[in-house]
């Protein structure tokens, strides 16, 4: 048994010759906040494993519900046989801090530089520092607060994709917050 559900992301990478690839990753997570660091776990036989190991960088693209078919396609097809970026009609934008490109259609893109690779077994874990991120302007409110619920992000569990709820069910610390007393006449 493994932890479920998990986020599902599209990872873009580029080899030393400048060839782009995209693949789906469900084993992804935050591993540190200062400095901000993420991890992705990849099987060594995957094409993108070689690209990422060569360049020591990648970009995590958070897909929305409307990109679920492309997410699945990029997880079941190999970049060795097909140009997945072309097949999915993704628009690539050059990274700001890394040579890899990100997918413009994804509402959130996170540029990463690898700090460590841990061999685990079926997968190797790539631990990477977040260098910068790109967030769709439509996710911000007038006070510059990010509303990820507007992004319609997706998750993965036991071979199925799920959309995430659009409403918050709690707020960090709400379980211990004290209720304010009402003042008469106020």
Question: Which ranges hold each PLM region?
Answer:
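Basic, polyanion-binding surface patches
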Residues: 1-186
């Amino acid at each position: 048994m493994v932890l479920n559900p998990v986020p599902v992301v599209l990872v873009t990478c580029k080899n030393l010759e400048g060839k782009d690839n995209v693949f789906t990753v469900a084993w992804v997570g935050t591993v540190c906040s200062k400095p901000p660091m993420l991890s992705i776990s990849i099987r060594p036989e995957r094409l993108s494993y070689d690209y990422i190991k060569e360049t020591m960088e990648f970009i995590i693209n958070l897909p929305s519900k409307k990109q679920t078919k492309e997410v699945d396609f990029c997880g079941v097809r190999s970049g060795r046989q097909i140009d997945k970026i072309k097949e999915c009609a993704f628009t690539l934008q050059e990274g700001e801090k890394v040579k890899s490109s990100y997918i413009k259609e994804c509402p959130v893109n996170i540029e990463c530089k690898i700090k460590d690779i841990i061999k685990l077994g079926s997968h190797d874990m790539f631990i990477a520092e977040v260098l910068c991120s790109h967030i769709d302007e439509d996710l911000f409110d007038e006070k510059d607060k990010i509303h990820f619920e507007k992004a319609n992000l997706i998750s993965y569990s036991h071979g199925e994709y799920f959309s995430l709820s659009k409403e918050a069910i709690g707020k960090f610390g709400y379980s211990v917050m004290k209720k304010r007393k009402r003042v008469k006449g106020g």
